[in-house]
Amino acid sequence: MKVALFFVEKVFPDEQEKFILFEGTAEGKIETGMFCRIQLNRSLGMTVPISNVARLSNNKVRLHTDFEEQEDFEIVFLMNIGEETFEIHDSE
């Protein structure tokens, strides 16, 4: 069930590829434990848990997505900032 949208404005990848921080604007309530769908390239995407949500201002938030539990993969993308939108779900 989709509960929010998140519009990406900045991306902060981790060099060891264990997590990515996304900063942007939220429409709807986003909480720790929800999931977001991340598209790694045109044909490969994955659903990952949101492990932390930091409120920066009104509807500005920073999401910490954790890949520690996911299978090994290589982050092969950097999003089109301002054009990427995530659907946030309350279940996987």
Give the positions of each predicted feature.
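Beta-strand/loop-dominated core regions that host nucleotide or nucleotide-derived cofactor-binding catalytic loops
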Residues: 2-27, 35-92
